[in-house]
Amino acid sequence: MAFILERAQAPQPASPATATLPVPTVQRLRRLNLAAAVFHLASAVLFLAIATDFDLPITASFPTEDPALTEQLFPAEVLTEVTIGYGVAAFSLLSALFHFLVATVANRPYNRAIAATQNPFRWIEYSLSSTLMIVLIVMLLGDYDIGALIGVAAANVAMILFGWLMERHNTPGADDVDWYPFVFGCIAGIAPWIVGTIYFAGALGNADEAVPTWVWALFISVFVMFNGFAVNQFLQYRRVGPWRSYVFGEGAYIALSFVAKTLLIWQVYFGTVR
């Protein structure tokens, strides 16, 4: 981990190692990260305190020659069950941990990275928390197959790593920005939503039961929020309006992360575990 952070914080030629942030900016970012840590922690603790147990299975299908299952060559077998409440609290706790780290013990390397228009801490946290989020989302939409869930997780991690690569190899506003990492990240990132859309559309096609309102809200709102991160990075590298400041984009990432996680937490609560 130390090697990864050291490499990630090494600035590119366009971002000199001597770059520093003004003291007011350092203080503002520290307060913002501390506030985010407190709110994420409070959300997780409150959720765990009031949520009831709600488990979903993780399944796998294996070929069989059981005569009793001649019409079902690949019956689904439950491997384990996941308590959704713990998963929901976990991604919020991960965010709280990373915000607390960059506001305290990792504050200096964080500030150096921000001055060099990079934030490796963000990408490491997202690779964990947002991946857990998207896996829980597709499970709530009805996908329990372990192979599909691993694919969803891998695609999301790839999206995050492409975002990190975009940041490592480019400088916002440069004439020679390489957009390939951004485009590849978008392609990888849409895969989990294709899986989710298949299950959501399948639920819509079920004439016997109406899709619960909370599922509509969950699918649409979190999809919009996830795409907000890509829009934020695009605006950073196009240097549009206030995004001319990398620090503004960093603040937008923090706000987007908090809103997306808060939406998911409470939509899950009102839809399933209350």
Question: What are these model-derived regions, one by one?
Answer:
Residues F3-V38, A42-P120, T131-R274:
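Polytopic alpha-helical membrane-helix bundles and their juxtamembrane interface segments
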Residues R122-E125:
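Right-handed parallel beta-helix
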